[in-house]
Amino acid sequence: MSTPLRGSSPQVSFYESELDQEGGSDASHFTYRNYMEDDKINSFTFNMARKDQTQLFQRIILTNESESEIEEYAEVAEQLLDAINLREKYVFHPKIWKADAPVGEKPPYSPFESDESTNCATEHMFKEVNGVYFVYSNETDMKSNKALFSVPHTLASYYKDINNLMMLSSYGPAKTFTFKRLQLLESKFNMHTLLNDSLELFQQKTAPHRDFYNVRKVDTHVHHSSSMNQKHLLKFIKRKLKENPNEIVIFRDDKYLTLAEVFKSLNLDVDELSVDTLDVHADNNTFHRFDKFNLKYNPCGQSRLREIFLKTDNLIKGKYLAEISKEVFTDLESSKYQCAEYRLSIYGRKMSEWDTLASWIVDNDLFSTKVRWLIQVPRLYDVYRETSTTTFQDFLNNVFHPLFEVTKDPSSHPKLHLFLQQVVGIDCVDDESKFEKKFTEKFPVPGEWSSEHNPPYTYYLYYLYANLYTLNQFREEKGLNILTLRPHSGEAGEVDHMGAAFYLAHGINHGINLRKTPVLQYLYYLTQIGIAMSPLSNNSLFLTYNRNPFPAFFARGLNVSISTDDPLQFHYTKEPLMEEYSIATQVWRLSVCDICEIARNSVLQSGFEHNVKSHWLGPDYANSGGNDIKKTNISDIRVCFRNETLIEELHLILKSLQTLPNFKNLNINFLLDKLPSEITTGNDYKLKKAQLKLNGANKLRNSSVGSTPNNGTPSSSGTPSLSSPGAIVHLMKTKPYIPPPLSLNIKQENNNNNNNNNNNNNNNNNNNTNTNTNSNSTTTNQDDNSKSDK
């Protein structure tokens, strides 16, 4: 049906849908009213802006889906569900940390004061077994190997799961199914914006004192040593040369050098310094050359300047980096609505790195309500092997042993205990384009890995994940905050990097290689894994801006945000995050609602505390479809569209699974938790959900679930009416679309339903009567399309 929103005719026709509940949730039905008058359209538009009403807008609803296609892709749906269920078993599901804290912008802790309730030492013991740390209640339990916590999967089973996932990603029917669904998702979004952009903009204008500039946005992926822009660094260096030229800053060539002597030895004059001589900005020579890009961290091409100005562990104990960090914090706080999650490095060369880094944070009072920290672990075991780490286990010990030690007894590392209050996650970084040995379950355990070759990405990620898993359980038991795994993944290299991250990570950075594998991309969509993308960074290193998949990912509904990565190398302005947003908006023609949605995604992906997110996004931010337009400036229509589209995709998976003969033995817990109760209100699904919660059994009776026919009254057979042959897409102004409850053999049941109705209406039933009834039904559908839309 065409909907002439503009034109010479003053009349606009659309459908408004109301959901009435009669006889309980199992007897829900729809009634439609067709408005053709201008005055009623105005009142409808006014109602659209009311927060207390269900959102009404033009929806795209597909009808007459082919049952043969649903059956054809049932096997694919089962494999997709298996992958999702495996992720649910792998990934650590944290409890909401201090959820009872009052809603506010400040975190529920004092940054440099420890909580007495979590500051006491306990009798817990821990030890490393085959590369993974395990925690025990006491020494007796440790001797008898009675660990408190365990890791869900071993290295061997992990690699088998990765292999299966890679086989699924190259499976023909799976690629066809997921590619079609992703294309349909993108087309749906384009149609939605075409039909409803003016309504979304109208809703945004009704939000008082709110626009894109004053909604919270988090830079979820930025490296701290390059958090300032090149002009800022240049001014800071010049200022230090003028104010403190005689300060001793480095020990080189068996003598101590002052700042002025360092520049003199490099033949650099303060008056001749410029952005060009600083030479820290990425250029054409860095494209596909990560080695040359790493050299850009050296101001003027000199490693000693990097050590003086951009390192925390140096002769002056990171004094200059702390000072410039405070200036960056001041810029963030002056902007008020911009926040950042900075990466600090732990290399795994020695255990004292943690205490050194924590002392730098605490001694310099580096804290801001706008900043949280992540620890990045570079994959450089092969570099340090000859000096400090003889096996990969030494590397893991240097990274994790201090964390378990401070969790057991905070007084053993008091500054580290305070610093960890502000740390929200672990990152894994390095050049993904390097060649690496293919993964196999026959890899040696870390204690036996003494090879000169670096372990592959998947090996690193598993042992970071496994040790974080037991550490988080330990910290959660003691009432401490937990650390999530959010690695770099999919910037370059093989697609198995993103497969490993799908199972193990809470979110990823970059992810541009998802464009190469529709199966993984669809899985990331269904599970809504956060993806922090950096288009300007990719443009200088691996992928030109016009080829970046960000706009496609966003349109399809993936949980994507925009981040800066390295402002020192890629940006020019004092507000690099706003620079990213402005370029993306202009190049990809994003609307105000689009960029506000991206900003909201960045807050959801971030590690800021629950009470802080509630203050920024509203108390319902964690609920499905929850939105407070007064805080997010996102139209309720947009949030409703995203939520309904995801529900429809999950519902399609469930419908496909229902055609399988072993459906009653499948674990559909994930789908039952994500889908609204209106879809799973039938007795069969109530029974199955109850049994899943009680004993894990999956039982489903082979009977259809009650539904609603088009005439607004409950059907005697409990099946939906499909009396609209040929109809493919209907544009409707409706309340949220709720797919009908599932039923088996819909076509056959529908025919039986029509025959039963004919028998009830006419005792002298014959073939002519049936023909007339079908003809009348078709005529009725032509007169009132509202009866064929469901």
Swiss-Prot record:
The keyword NAD does not apply. Substrate binds at residues 223, 292-297, 491, 566-569. Its EC number is 3.5.4.6. Residues 1-14 have a biased composition (Polar residues). Residues 706-726, 750-781 have a biased composition (Low complexity). Binds 1 zinc ion per subunit. This is AMP deaminase. It comes from Dictyostelium discoideum.
